[in-house]
């Protein structure tokens, strides 16, 4: 399958886009076709073995329109050219329409003045007054009309061409309506001439008042005025992305062979050393090699506070170096940069169609033929009821010019384009219109714990000394832990470094599996580990041990430290909750969304996190491979589910969910399994994404309502339905004005989304009274049986294990379980602190528990 984007020319309304879509969709091999009227583009997914680009272009041309392959973004400037090509085209269209409008007004104003002046009492030259000058009066109007028709000839060229091809569009309605007025006006000139020849002044007077040239000219000018305003508004729909692309630098300072030089951005190569000075834009994505800086990433990630950068940190192209000087190595250039990927994602999203637009698409396909039929029937009906030709003709013209298929075609894409652009500015990348629509109806948000609710990195939360002083305890602990590879050790070392404490000399370092580490710190034997280690070495301190248990109840991991047989204190380490997680969860709950947390932790730790952030429900002890099953279980219960995860370990769950949201993507925005990508690691952006989705869908519904309501009311009024009862009849010029402004209204309403701002409240998390009403449940990992080739029954059991802290621990447990007779396979997972074993019927739970305990760890439960 291949997916390509095409630029389509000649479309003017929803009927045009509908015809192009149908023409391509019926080609053999075409799987999916989406035409975007706003962007004049088409995305086609097709089977290359059955269909080619040339055949697709030929199908569009046969339908009466032009098509060409869309330029593919390359480097940042190329991306800018490709994406802003639409903006440039919109700007050119606006410029052309302004010229057409100015020239049209140049002739329409005197035409209108001449035709209406005698009725309004305006001064007119004597040669235009009185019945004796009727021919001069009529012919001058005709001459003033001709340049207006020529200036707006495109309506006739396209309108009659599509009518001839039996696929009439909005231009057909304009061409038919104005042509009817012109033909009748020419007929009136002949009748005036005949009247003069026969000296029939009554005929002269009658047709002198029924010329309709001013109606034809004014209709064309008013529609051009509306299209000018529409073109201006359309140009603003892509403002967000245009401004984003404007940030991309055109040049970069590169250092090659010790020589600095300024080169065009497209010449930057992978691995180049680049120099970025204060006030300059970061040219491409890369890694800081030397120097420090404060970088403003707000344009890409929505993060308002500048981010401090130093050697080893990543930087994103198109962000601004606010202060400092640094050297960087280019790691992503051209189409691979975050900026280019953002442009591509937004471009694809704005080219896609939301399911909500399907009704409008169906109506657009038959709208124009139905309107023409109504106009013919209305004209004939009024003639048959004895009304004058002038009256019946004005009815028919009014029906033709008031009908507006454009509003139907613009209702959805304008809101989608502005909404996705606004999301991109806030660091929220929505990949498709369908994802945007689905998000607004989500009623359950599932959050992965690690890295989503929490920081994903252990930090020191509590330091409790046993009398030797906090700094002394940290210094001793960090000195010993510095030799360990354990993740919790890194947290203690980082805390000591942050406080600039002294690291002491350590000898005879030793790791004790399942317990901790030991060594001599400046000649004194130091033990560091869990409570089991303290008990094994007969070290007691009831007060400190009790405090450790209390910290464990809060979901923290207490590490005890003893010096020469005496407990000197404990340090608690935990993966702490992000500052905004509780607020974000409270906001989601206030929007009527149930929040569920999935975690591999045991129920005790899960409950501690739940109490901190106020989630509605927690599913604990979930293995990474089982997250997708939990999502499916929620969906089977009738829930519309959004899954929020890191996009890597959670890929199956993200793909299974109705909406997959990858959080904290940073520069990696092309996460395949996600429908929405959040560049920041902030749960508040989930709330923002839901609010934005609801705002966009509400806007689309407003637009569609207006488009249907306008036509449903306007067409009957124009047809004279209310004339017998209320003498309500629409002038064709008023109909043209109404039609022009209906499209302008739809686009202008969509532009309101440019000022969308998420409402974030400082809401406190819901209070949880006690674990008894916690809503924490253990994942449904039922024991599964299967028959092997020999007919033996293998069972799968899941063991929850305490005490594992690193990959060494994982290896120890795996070896211990694999050595148990009857165990076919053992898989140990550090994140969920569990082991999944495949065993035959002879293996007992007691044997598995004994194997884990003998390895120095604790088997908490076996399922």
What are these regions (language model features)?
Residues 28-37, 41-46, 50, 211-213, ...:
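Conserved cytosolic catalytic loops of P-type ATPases
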Residues 55, 61-70, 74-81, 85, ...:
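Actuator/coupling domain of P-type ATPases
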Residues 120-136, 164, 183, 422, ...:
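Membrane-embedded alpha-helical bundles of multi-pass transporters
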Residues 1-136, 148, 234, 243, ...:
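Flexible metal-binding regulatory segments at protein termini and peripheral loops
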């Amino acid at each position: 399958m291949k997916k390509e984007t095409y630029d389509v020319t000649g479309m003017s309304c929803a009927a045009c886009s509908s015809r192009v879509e149908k023409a391509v969709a019926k080609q053999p091999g075409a799987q999916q076709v989406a035409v975007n009227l706003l962007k004049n583009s088409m995305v086609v997914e097709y089977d290359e073995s059955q269909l080619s680009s040339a055949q697709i272009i030929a199908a569009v041309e046969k339908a009466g329109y032009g098509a060409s392959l869309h330029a593919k973004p390359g480097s940042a400037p190329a991306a800018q050219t490709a994406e802003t090509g639409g903006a440039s085209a919109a700007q050119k269209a606006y410029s052309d329409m302004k010229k057409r409008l100015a020239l049209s007004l140049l002739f329409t104003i005197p035409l209108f003045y001449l035709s209406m002046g005698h009725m309004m009492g305006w001064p007119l030259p004597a040669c235009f007054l009185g019945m004796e000058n009727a021919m001069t009066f009529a012919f001058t109007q005709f001459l003033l009309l001709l340049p207006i028709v020529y200036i707006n000839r495109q309506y006739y060229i396209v309108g009659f061409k599509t009518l001839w091809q039996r696929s009439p569009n909005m231009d057909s309605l304009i061409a038919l309506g104005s042509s009817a007025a012109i033909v009748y006006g020419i007929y009136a000139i002949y009748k005036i001439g005949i009247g003069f020849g026969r000296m029939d002044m009554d005929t002269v007077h009658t047709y002198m008042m029924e010329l309709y040239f001013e109606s034809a000219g004014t209709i064309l000018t008013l529609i051009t005025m509306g299209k000018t305003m529409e073109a201006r508004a359309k140009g603003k729909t892509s403002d967000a992305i245009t401004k984003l692309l404007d940030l991309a630098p055109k040049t970069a300072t590169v250092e090659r062979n010790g020589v600095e030089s300024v080169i065009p951005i497209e010449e930057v190569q992978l691995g180049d050393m680049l120099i970025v000075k204060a006030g300059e834009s970061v040219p491409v994505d890369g890694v800081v090699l030397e120097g420090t800086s404060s970088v403003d990433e707000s344009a890409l990630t929505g993060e308002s506070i500048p981010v401090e950068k130093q050697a080893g940190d990543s930087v994103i192209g198109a962000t601004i170096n606010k202060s400092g000087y640094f050297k960087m190595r280019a790691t992503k250039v051209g189409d691979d940069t975050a900026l280019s990927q953002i442009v591509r994602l937004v471009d694809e999203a704005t080219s896609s169609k939301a399911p909500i637009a399907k009704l409008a698409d169906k109506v657009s396909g038959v709208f124009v033929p139905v309107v023409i039929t109504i106009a013919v029937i209305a004209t004939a009906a009024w003639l048959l009821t004895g009304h004058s030709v002038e009256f019946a003709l004005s009815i028919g013209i009014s029906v033709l010019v008031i009908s507006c298929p454009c509003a139907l075609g613009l209702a959805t894409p304008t809101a989608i384009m502005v909404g996705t652009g606004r999301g991109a500015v806030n660091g929220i990348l929505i990949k498709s219109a369908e994802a945007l629509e689905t998000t607004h109806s989500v009623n359950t948000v599932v959050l992965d714990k690690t890295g989503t609710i929490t920081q994903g990195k252990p930090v020191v939360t509590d330091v409790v000394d046993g009398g030797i002083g906090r700094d002394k305890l940290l210094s001793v602990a960090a000195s010993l832990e510095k030799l360990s590879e354990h993740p919790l050790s890194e947290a203690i070392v980082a805390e000591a470094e942050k406080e600039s404490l002294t690291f002491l000399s350590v000898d005879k370092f030793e790791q004790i599996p399942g317990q901790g580490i030991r060594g001599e710190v400046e000649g004194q034997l130091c033990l560091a580990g869990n409570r089991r280690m303290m008990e094994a070495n007969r070290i007691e301190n009831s007060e400190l041990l009790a405090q450790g248990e209390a910290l464990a109840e809060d979901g923290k991991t207490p590490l005890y430290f003893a010096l020469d047989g005496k407990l000197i204190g404990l340090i608690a380490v935990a993966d702490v909750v992000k500052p905004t997680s509780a607020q974000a969860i409270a906001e989601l709950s206030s929007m009527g969304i149930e929040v569920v947390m999935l975690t591999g932790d045991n129920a005790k730790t899960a409950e501690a996190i739940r109490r901190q952030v106020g989630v509605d429900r927690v599913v604990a002890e979930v293995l990474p491979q089982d997250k997708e099953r939990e999502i499916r279980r929620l969906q089977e219960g009738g829930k519309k589910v959004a899954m929020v995860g890191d996009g890597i370990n959670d890929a199956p769950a993200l793909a299974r969910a109705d909406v997959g949201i990858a959080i904290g993507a940073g520069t990696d925005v092309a996460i395949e399994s996600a429908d929405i990508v959040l560049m920041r690691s902030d749960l508040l952006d989930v709330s923002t994404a839901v609010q934005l989705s609801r705002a966009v869908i509400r806007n689309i519904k407003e637009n569609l309502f207006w488009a249907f309501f306008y036509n449903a009311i306007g067409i009957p009024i124009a047809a004279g339905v209310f004339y017998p009862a209320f003498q309500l009849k629409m002038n064709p010029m008023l109909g043209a004005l109404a039609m022009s402004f209906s499209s302008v209204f739809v686009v202008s309403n969509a532009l309101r989304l440019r000022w969308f701002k998420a409402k974030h409240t400082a809401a406190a998390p819901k209070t949880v009274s006690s674990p008894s009403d916690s809503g924490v449940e253990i994942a449904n990992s039922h024991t599964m049986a299967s028959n092997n080739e020999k007919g033996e029954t293998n069972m799968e059991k899941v063991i929850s294990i305490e005490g594992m802290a690193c990959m060494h621990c994982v290896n120890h447990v795996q070896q211990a379980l694999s050595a148990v007779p009857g165990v076919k396979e053992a898989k140990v997972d550090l994140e969920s602190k569990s082991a999944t074993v495949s065993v035959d019927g002879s293996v007992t739970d007691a044997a598995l528990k004994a194997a884990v305990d003998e390895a120095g760890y604790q088997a908490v439960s076996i399922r």
